[in-house]
Amino acid sequence: MIGMLTGRVESVETDTALIDVGGVGYETRMPATDLGRLHAGQDACVFTYLNLSQDSVTLYGFLDRDSKRVFLQLIKVSGIGPKVAQSLLGTMTPSQLARAIADNDAAALAKAPGLGRKGAQKIILELKGSVDLNQSDDASAGNAPYQPTVDAGVEQVVEGLVSLGWRQQDAQRAVNEACAENDVPMPLASDDAPRVLRLALARMDRGR
């Protein structure tokens, strides 16, 4: 079982990140919130779960242990598969999820793509009172969430694109590709940010 990957981020796509560990690339499906914190060339630690089915093998990943632990709780709920569980963790943090369950807030849970109100009600019914879930976001000794290196310049450009109406995932991917294709040094210097913003915006406009 592959429980964790530590290596270099080779690329970030809409739903996945490619992590190079010792020359082997692991395509890892991750929540949108985590993908938005990654960029090509960054070192990262990803906590993973390998899902085996009749027709596919999928590696799911998270940037902190709490999210993975809650993910494992969610996929134990009848009718909730790993894709939906990860979708839910892409719309709210473990602590927000725990609060929604405690408050019987099915509407908040149902906002996750692919879940629906019935699935949200099942989660509340089966996980309410779960010790592990209610202790999520606990940064106790030996279990502190991993904090990836943050490139302030990249974040600045991504935020600029988001403010113009682009989705964060699309903005992040465009910035990564613009930097890679134009040999922009990383971490991104503040002087390079306006240029990268123009390059990324041009890429996104062409893709419309």
From Swiss-Prot:
GO aspect biological process, one term: DNA repair
Span list, region Domain I: 1-63
GO CC annotation, single: Holliday junction helicase complex
Keywords: Cytoplasm, DNA damage, DNA recombination, DNA repair, DNA-binding
Region (Flexible linker): 143-151
Entry GO MF terms: ATP binding; four-way junction DNA binding; four-way junction helicase activity
Region (Domain II): 64-142
Family to which this protein belongs: Belongs to the RuvA family.
Functional summary from the UniProt entry: The RuvA-RuvB-RuvC complex processes Holliday junction (HJ) DNA during genetic recombination and DNA repair, while the RuvA-RuvB complex plays an important role in the rescue of blocked DNA replication forks via replication fork reversal (RFR). RuvA specifically binds to HJ cruciform DNA, conferring on it an open structure. The RuvB hexamer acts as an ATP-dependent pump, pulling dsDNA into and through the RuvAB complex. HJ branch migration allows RuvC to scan DNA until it finds its consensus sequence, where it cleaves and resolves the cruciform DNA.
Protein name per UniProt: Holliday junction branch migration complex subunit RuvA
Organism: Bifidobacterium longum subsp. infantis (strain ATCC 15697 / DSM 20088 / JCM 1222 / NCTC 11817 / S12)
Lineage: Bacteria, Bacillati, Actinomycetota, Actinomycetes, Bifidobacteriales
